[in-house]
Each structure stands twice: as structure tokens, then as C-alpha cells.
């Protein structure tokens, strides 16, 4: 698979990225995410996306482990390491896994997990139509 994933403080290939099926983000949809795009060296509205992501984390009472500057660097490095001209970028902060089974479902004890990835951008309408525009009938 093409792209790169940042998790557990390291960059890995998408096929090597693993998460527990007991992660609250998976079980309860207890996760904050944002999606961005890049074309060439330009990452579309990066600062606005990071700000929105941070506000969502606060709303979910999740502690984002990275500053805005660190997140900018992580995203830029994901795009760079992907080697792609156009990318779909996703940021996720999950409530995480409760490390001790004796704690049951006490999500306050979960270990949060941040993940970022950059994978090939998919032109839903095709690249030309996306640039020139199209008609939508509702």
C-alpha cells in the first residue's frame, strides 16, 4: 500500500500500522478526526484544520499530545515521506485502550492514541472536473 502512517512516535508503512480492536475509537467511535488534502508542496488550510482538530479534542475532553507546531511538522513529514504529489491526510486522536482489564470500561484510564497518515488522494469527480467544476442536481 502506498503512503505513510505516523503512530507511536514513528513513521511506518500503512500495512505495518496496527491498532487494538479494544481501542475505544474502534468500539465506541470515541475518536476525534480531521481530513486534509495536499497538492504538491501545498497542504490545504493546514493551520485551520489543526485548530479545528484541537477544538474538537477539547470538546471530547481528549488531551492532544502535540502542539500546533508539532502537528504541522508531523503532517508535513507524512506528506514528504509518502512521496506522493497529491495526498489525503487524516489526523485521529482516539480515547485509546484501557490497559488493565480490572478497570473494566473506565474510559478515564484509557491510553489515548494519536495517528496521522498520508495516502494517495482520490479524485471523486476526476481531476479535470474537480478543477473546472461540475453541476449537481439536488
Regions found by a protein language model. Give the residues of each.
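Conserved alpha/beta cores of soluble small-molecule-handling proteins
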Residues: 1-138
Amino acid at each position: 500500500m502506498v503512503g505513510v502512517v505516523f503512530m507511536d512516535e514513528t513513521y511506518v508503512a500503512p500495512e505495518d500500522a496496527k491498532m487494538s480492536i479494544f481501542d475505544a475509537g474502534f468500539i465506541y467511535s470515541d475518536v476525534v478526526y480531521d481530513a486534509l488534502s495536499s497538492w504538491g508542496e501545498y497542504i490545504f488550510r493546514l493551520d485551520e484544520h489543526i485548530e479545528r482538530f484541537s477544538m474538537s479534542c477539547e470538546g471530547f475532553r481528549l488531551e492532544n499530545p502535540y502542539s500546533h507546531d508539532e502537528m504541522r511538522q508531523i503532517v508535513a513529514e507524512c506528506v514528504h515521506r509518502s512521496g506522493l504529489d497529491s495526498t489525503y491526510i487524516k489526523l485521529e486522536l482516539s480515547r485509546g485502550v484501557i490497559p488493565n482489564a480490572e478497570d473494566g470500561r473506565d474510559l478515564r484510564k484509557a491510553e489515548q492514541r494519536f495517528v496521522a497518515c498520508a495516502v494517495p488522494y482520490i479524485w471523486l469527480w476526476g481531476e479535470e472536473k474537480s478543477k473546472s467544476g461540475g453541476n449537481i442536481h439536488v
